[in-house]
C-alpha cells in the first residue's frame, strides 16, 4: 500500500512516464488493485492510499543478448536516469551523458523517436529497447 498519487504515477496511463513508472514496468505490469480512503485509518492521514500490485514480475527484458542480467539492468537505469536528469531538456541532449551522439541518433532513427522528445514522452517498452541500443 502506497499513497494514491504514487500508485497512479507507477501505473502512468496518461502517456507521461516517470522514472518510477518505467522502473516498475521494466519488471512487471503494475495495476491499482484498490483505493483506500484516508478515513479508513486512525488517525486519518491527509492523503488517500492505494494497493499497488505488480503482476508478471520477471527480468525477461534483461535476460537476452550479451552480458549478465545484472549488468544490463544497471545499464538500463544509467540510461533512464540520464534521460530524466534535466526534465526541461530534450531527451537526446540528456542522453549524451550515457552514450555518444552517433549512437543516440541511430537509436532515435531506429525507434522513430522525435529529436524533440522529452524523457516523459517515451513509453517504458521503448526505454528498454533504447537502453539496449545504447549499450
Task: State where each predicted segment sits.
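Class I S-adenosyl-L-methionine
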Residues: 1-119, 129-135
Amino acid at each position: 500500500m502506497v499513497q494514491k498519487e504514487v500508485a497512479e504515477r507507477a501505473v502512468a496511463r496518461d502517456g507521461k512516464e516517470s522514472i518510477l513508472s518505467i522502473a516498475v514496468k521494466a519488471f512487471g505490469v503494475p495495476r491499482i488493485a484498490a483505493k483506500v480512503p484516508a478515513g479508513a485509518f486512525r488517525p486519518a492521514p491527509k492523503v488517500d492510499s492505494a494497493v499497488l500490485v505488480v503482476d508478471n514480475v520477471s527480468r525477461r527484458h534483461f535476460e537476452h543478448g550479451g552480458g549478465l542480467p545484472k549488468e544490463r539492468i544497471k545499464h538500463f537505469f544509467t540510461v533512464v536516469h540520464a534521460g530524466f536528469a534535466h526534465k526541461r531538456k530534450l531527451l537526446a541532449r540528456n542522453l549524451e551523458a550515457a552514450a555518444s551522439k552517433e549512437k543516440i541518433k541511430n537509436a532515435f532513427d531506429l525507434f522513430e523517436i522525435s529529436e524533440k522528445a522529452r524523457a516523459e514522452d517515451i513509453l517504458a517498452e521503448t526505454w528498454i529497447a533504447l537502453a539496449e541500443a545504447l549499450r
